[in-house]
């Protein structure tokens, strides 16, 4: 289900006008500049991001045919209630492929983001519920081997790195291998790079999907964890 799209459009690559618009909105973040460059935004940033999202959605749907995935492309407009001195427009655009659950920020989600000076993609949680991360640590305590196997494989690759906020105090005794994972409040497996020639390449979706394939074992691990928490909460009601 492509929430944000109607007709399928193939990604042809971003272009220099994409980059120019992103820098422009960063330094000219006001309505008059945006209105003058709205067509540039729609043609050179929004349209290719949607096309990229559609191809990532199709690829992930093929890998995870039983998951109720949807595609979401972000709005460039900031929430007027939360400007906090910032301009009315974001200087970046992101998309995510996720399940349709209402509390999706607490579930594993695949994403791509582009900004004036970087692009990133990966999979992770942004606002994992404390109860979910508590269950995560309980599962590691009870049987660390499944995650250890995944982490050893993860540590051999060069594309993604583990990111996310950590607890200041130790949450328990765990092996050196798993300690960085055990201490996370939420986590993301992220690839971030300065803008380079890859973003202009029509093969970018295929390259990202091949990288996402390497994250599928983590996606399944955390999806199973979410399901276990749902069952546990259902019993408690």
Which positions does each model-derived feature cover?
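Compact, glycine/acidic-enriched structural inserts
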Residues: 116-174
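Inter-helical turn/loop segments and adjacent helix faces that build the functional surface
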Residues: 29-36, 130-134, 201-202
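A short, surface-exposed loop/turn module that caps and links secondary-structure elements
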Residues: 62-89, 93, 158-172
């Amino acid at each position: 289900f492509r929430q944000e799209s109607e007709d399928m459009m193939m990604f042809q690559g971003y272009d220099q006008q994409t980059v120019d618009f992103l820098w422009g909105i960063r330094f000219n973040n006001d309505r008059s500049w945006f209105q003058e460059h709205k067509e540039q935004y729609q043609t050179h940033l929004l349209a290719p991001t949607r096309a990229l999202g559609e191809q990532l959605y199709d690829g992930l749907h093929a890998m995870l045919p039983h998951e109720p995935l949807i595609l979401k492309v972000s709005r460039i407009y900031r929430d007027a209630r939360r400007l906090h001195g910032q301009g009315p427009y974001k200087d970046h655009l992101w998309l995510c492929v996720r399940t349709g659950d209402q509390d999706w920020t607490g579930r594993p989600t695949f994403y791509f983001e582009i900004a004036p000076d970087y692009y990133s993609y990966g999979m992770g949680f942004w606002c994992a519920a404390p109860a979910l991360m508590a269950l995560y640590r309980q599962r590691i305590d009870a049987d660390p081997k499944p995650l250890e196997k995944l982490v050893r494989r993860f540590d051999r690759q060069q594309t993604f790195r583990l990111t996310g906020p950590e607890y200041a105090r130790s949450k328990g005794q765990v092996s050196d291998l798993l300690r960085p994972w055990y201490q996370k409040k939420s986590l993301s497996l992220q690839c971030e790079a300065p803008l380079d020639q890859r973003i202009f390449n029509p093969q970018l979706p295929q390259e990202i999907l091949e990288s996402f394939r390497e994250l599928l074992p983590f996606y399944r691990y955390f999806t199973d964890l979410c399901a276990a928490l749902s069952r546990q909460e259902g019993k408690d009601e």
